[in-house]
Amino acid sequence: MSLELLSKLETKIQATLETIELLKMELEEEKQKTSALNEQNQQLSEQNQQLQQELASWNDKVTGLVGLLNSEI
């Protein structure tokens, strides 16, 4: 009986260790995905800032041109 219990315990421990290893691998994959998403987020934030600056520049140019048209009318 004692050997049977030890065998069952060993089986459960082995299954638990395998589960832990799988979870570690999944965690590593999620960390890599998170890192890639953070990098993509940073790039998109920089692109957004650049586009906002370009939009502001164009708005200034259009405002200047409208001002010139109004002064000539």
UniProtKB/Swiss-Prot annotation:
GO cellular component assignments: cytoplasm
Gene from which this protein is expressed: zapB
Family that this chain belongs to: Belongs to the ZapB family.
Protein name listed in UniProt: Cell division protein ZapB
Keywords assigned: Cell cycle, Cell division, Coiled coil, Cytoplasm, Septation
Domain of life: Bacteria
Subunit-structure text: Homodimer. The ends of the coiled-coil dimer bind to each other, forming polymers. Interacts with FtsZ.
Pfam families, alphabetized: ZapB
